[in-house]
């Protein structure tokens, strides 16, 4: 059995998230999803939806076998539980594949890291674009 790990914030679920998880799932038979903690997100605005609610939404997706929250202290801690064979990164995730693989190896993991290519194309395949659309609509209503 090949264990796959996908990670992300998953704030305001949209078709881009589903596409990422469906593509990640193709790399193995068991898909684990690590949902980022509110306190650890630094490379973009803090999520609108609280972490426990985001986790609940991800768990409800048919493509996902297991979902868990990340660690606030050590991003590698949940990997001890999951023991992934492959980590699949989305096109826009901030990690460098080789650098992450090296860090994993130094911690005793024999995990391959792959990055998906082109993102799913749709008008609102971005939490940021969804928020922007809501704000624009709200302004026109005022």
Curated annotation (Swiss-Prot):
Major enzyme class: transferase
Homology family: Belongs to the archaeal FAD synthase family.
Keyword Nucleotide-binding: yes
Catalytic activity: FMN + ATP + H(+) = FAD + diphosphate
Residues the entry annotates as binding ATP: 9-10, 14-17, 92
Transferase keyword on record: yes
Keywords: ATP-binding, FAD, Flavoprotein, FMN, Nucleotide-binding, Nucleotidyltransferase, Transferase
One GO molecular-function entry: ATP binding
Gene Ontology biological process: FAD biosynthetic process; FMN metabolic process
Domain of life: Archaea
Cofactor: a divalent metal cation
Pfam families: CTP_transf_like
Pathway connected to this protein: Cofactor biosynthesis; FAD biosynthesis; FAD from FMN: step 1/1
Complexes and interactors: Homodimer.
Protein name: FAD synthase
Xref: PANTHER family: FAD SYNTHASE
The enzyme's E.C. designation: 2.7.7.2
Record's function text: Catalyzes the transfer of the AMP portion of ATP to flavin mononucleotide (FMN) to produce flavin adenine dinucleotide (FAD) coenzyme.
